[in-house]
Amino acid sequence: MILDKLVESTRIRVEQEKRDIPLKIVKEKALKMEKGNFSFEKVIAEDEISFICEIKKASPSKGVIAEEFPYIQIAKEYEGAGASCISVLTEPDYFKGDKKYLEEISRNVTIPLLRKDFVIDEYMIYDAKIHGASCVLLICSILGKKELEKYIQICDDLGMSALVEACLLYTSP
């Protein structure tokens, strides 16, 4: 299953990142930053339609979507079109994402950014904050209940939102 491959690839990547820059350092840096105040709940409760636009270079099913990838220009166009938030893929192996996209976009737009990755470790949340994210995606099917609760609390502590993805597998009778 592709999700299992994505999680394993992420696990290997995060372990390397933690060897390069330990959790303690990343956590301290993130906690020293100004708390954010973006709330997905507030955005989706507005009377007008809100939309999240996505910055994605590739996908496992389609491969590379665009060789030429002016992600900053795309983000500026999304903001100009009225996007409420921009989702930035940072998963490098299957989606060809990069944390530099998140960081550089955060310096060029004023709307909130969602780090879209397969968050499996608290390290990734602190790292998302450092790279300019206002929100992270938490996927229930790859996290246990205690991890999910802990990660939501970390987001709260950092002034970030947690967008929790849950799906129910249903088979008809």
Protein language model annotation of sequence segments:
Residues Y170-P173:
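Conserved small/polar residues in nucleotide/adenosyl-binding loops
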Residues K57-I86:
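Active-site cofactor/substrate anionic-group-binding motifs, chiefly glycine-
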Residues D98-L114, Y151-L163:
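Alpha-helix-loop-beta-strand connector modules within alpha/beta enzyme cores
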Residues I86-Y94, P112-I120, C135-K145, S161-L168:
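Catalytic beta/alpha-barrel core
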Residues D47-F51, A83-S84, V109-P112, A133-S134, ...:
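Short, well-ordered coil/turn segments that N-cap beta-strands
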Residues I2-A66:
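An N-cap/entry alpha-helix motif that binds or orients negatively charged groups
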